[in-house]
């Protein structure tokens, strides 16, 4: 997911008190439980993604490996640490991971990650040798989270794994079992979507014009403008239909448009695929990630340029008049991840530093903030609320 996600929100407590925030964590820097801070680089320990398991009350947090970041997949027990800036613990199920950008939890309480298989810096190839990118799943229902699935993505499918963006896990019939699962991974550099069929242990990639950057995005930071050019980045899944398929909603990192495709088409290794443009969210609404809430039928967007969380009810047409804002802060700089947990809680994260070269982090303010809100409360009184 390229290190620009690692170069990412000097976040303070200003400007957020008016929002109905249920939980908030804020770190000036990341520390690891049981590891001497002198043994690793604080400035390189940049969180990019997370997933909250509502059953265990644990948050799984990813830190792409830069030299010398000791752990790429960690966990946080929210029962022990309900707020503040707690240290992160090593995820017990991972010993040989190279570099992970984002975790996802599915309906079967499996934690999925995509290991890029390589790091983004030179000089330590002997210490951290390059491997094939891999899709890995862990069982959160068992002690120590045993690994239950691993698939190495062929190089001709993975392309440049440092271009992996978000991904979504599609369990086609969770009520009857978890064996039939697909994983959809975006690649914003190659402008492709990777499909993994867990049952058949096969994968393929799809290309389409809607995966390409729509334009050059202008990111304003400290009064200066910087250009980003990012292809398909965020993806989220809608409701299951009677045939076990869903609508997959996706967006480009340098686009204000939203598209959808039926997963029925994505699951076919060869064949015609119908991609549908849904509309435009409006100027300066570029986002890296989005999350669908099945209870409210609302999609939430984490907008990196406008420093806000916006919403759109999928039962309405998509245009700027039907977009609303549930959170905004001038200090919410370059949000990187957003997701729903199984209790319909919305979680979103900013890591404090935009993708700008030669910008030094300062550690007198929180750089990382993780916030949760109740979805129904957050959209109450907004355009995203559909009243009966």
From Swiss-Prot:
InterPro entries: 6-blade_b-propeller_TolB-like (IPR011042), Royal_jelly/protein_yellow (IPR017996). It is found in: Secreted. Residues 1-18 form the signal peptide. Keywords: Glycoprotein, Secreted, Signal. Female salivary gland (at protein level). GO terms for cellular component: extracellular region. It comes from the Eukaryota. Glycans are attached at residue 29. Belongs to the major royal jelly protein family. Probably modulates blood feeding of sand flies on vertebrate species by binding and sequestering different mediators involved in the host response. Binds biogenic amines. Binds noradrenaline with medium affinity. Binds octopamine with low affinity. Poorly binds histamine, adrenaline and serotonin. This is Yellow-related salivary protein SP03. It comes from Phlebotomus perniciosus. The lineage of its organism: Eukaryota, Metazoa, Ecdysozoa, Arthropoda, Hexapoda.
């Amino acid at each position: 997911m390229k290190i620009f996600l690692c170069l990412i929100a000097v976040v303070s407590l200003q400007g957020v008190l008016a929002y109905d925030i249920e939980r908030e964590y804020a770190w000036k820097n990341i520390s690891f439980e049981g590891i001497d801070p002198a043994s690793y680089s604080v400035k390189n320990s940049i969180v990019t993604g997370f997933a909250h398991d509502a059953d265990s009350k644990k948050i799984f947090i990813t830190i792409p490996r830069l030299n010398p970041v000791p752990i790429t997949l960690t966990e946080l027990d929210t029962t022990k640490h309900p707020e503040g800036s707690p240290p992160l613990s090593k995820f017990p199920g991972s010993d040989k991971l190279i570099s992970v950008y984002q975790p996802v939890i599915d309906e079967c309480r499996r934690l999925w990650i995509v290991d890029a298989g390589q790091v983004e810096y030179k000089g330590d190839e002997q210490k951290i040798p390059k491997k094939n990118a891999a899709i890995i799943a862990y069982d959160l229902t068992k002690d120590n989270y045993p690994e239950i699935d691993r698939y190495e993505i062929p190089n001709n499918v993975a392309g440049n794994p440092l271009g992996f963006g978000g991904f979504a896990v599609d369990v086609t019939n969770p009520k009857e079992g978890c064996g039939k699962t697909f994983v959809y991974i975006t690649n914003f550099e190659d402008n492709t979507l990777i499909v993994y069929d867990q049952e058949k242990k096969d994968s393929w990639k799809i290309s389409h014009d809607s995966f390409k950057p729509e334009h050059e995005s202008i990111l304003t930071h400290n009064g200066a403008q910087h250009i980003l050019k990012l292809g398909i980045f965020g993806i989220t899944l809608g409701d299951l239909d009677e045939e076990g398929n869903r609508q997959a909603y996706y967006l480009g990192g340098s686009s204000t448009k939203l598209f959808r495709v039926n997963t029925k088409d994505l699951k076919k290794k060869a064949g015609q695929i119908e991609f549908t443009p849904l509309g435009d969210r409006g100027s300066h609404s570029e986002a890296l990630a989005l999350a669908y809430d099945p209870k409210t039928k609302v999609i939430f967007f984490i907008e990196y340029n406008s420093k806000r969380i916006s919403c759109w009810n999928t039962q309405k047409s998509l245009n700027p008049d039907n977009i609303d804002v549930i959170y905004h802060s001038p200090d919410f700089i370059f949000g990187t991840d957003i997701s729903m947990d199984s209790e319909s809680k919305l979680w979103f994260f900013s890591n404090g530093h935009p993708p700008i070269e030669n910008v030094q982090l300062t550690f007198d303010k929180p750089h990382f903030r993780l916030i949760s809100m109740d979805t129904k409360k957050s959209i109450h009184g907004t355009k995203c609320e559909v009243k009966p």
